């Protein structure tokens, strides 16, 4: 495990990582978590309202009690010992793709059409 200073060039770090840990005490949407999944990284995240909403019933992520360092360490150890990474990576990429800008724009476009023209 390594902790790095802030950088805008995160792609290289994602490429050399095996898991992504989001240990926030508060989080808005969690776009960085979606970006990590788009790079095939399974996620260990604080159990926050947004992470619970985004990751419920997802096989490529686990939630730990916010602030519970022992539980976080246990999940990190568990994930480090896993050998079935490929399916988790594929699931992460597949799920992150649902947040692709084109799909989000299409969803908004469809919603706005329903609002403007009524439900058909």
Residue ranges, per PLM feature:
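A short, well-ordered alpha-helix in the C-terminal region of glycosyltransferases
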Residues: 84-98, 110
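Aromatic "clamp/platform" in nucleotide-sugar-dependent glycosyltransferases that forms part
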Residues: 6, 25
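Short hydrophobic beta-strand element within catalytic cores of glycosyltransferases
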Residues: 42-45
């Amino acid at each position: 495990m390594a902790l790095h200073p802030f950088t805008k060039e995160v792609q290289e770090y994602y490429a050399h990582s095996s898991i992504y840990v989001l240990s926030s005490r508060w989080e808005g949407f969690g776009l960085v978590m979606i970006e990590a999944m788009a790079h095939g990284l399974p996620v260990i995240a604080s159990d926050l309202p947004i992470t619970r909403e985004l990751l419920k019933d997802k096989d490529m992520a686990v939630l730990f009690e916010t602030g519970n360092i022992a539980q976080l360490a246990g999940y990190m150890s568990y994930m480090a010992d896993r050998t079935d990474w490929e399916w988790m990576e594929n699931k992460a990429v597949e799920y992150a793709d649902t947040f692709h800008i084109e799909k989000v724009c299409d969803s908004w476009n469809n919603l706005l059409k329903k609002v403007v023209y009524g439900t058909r």
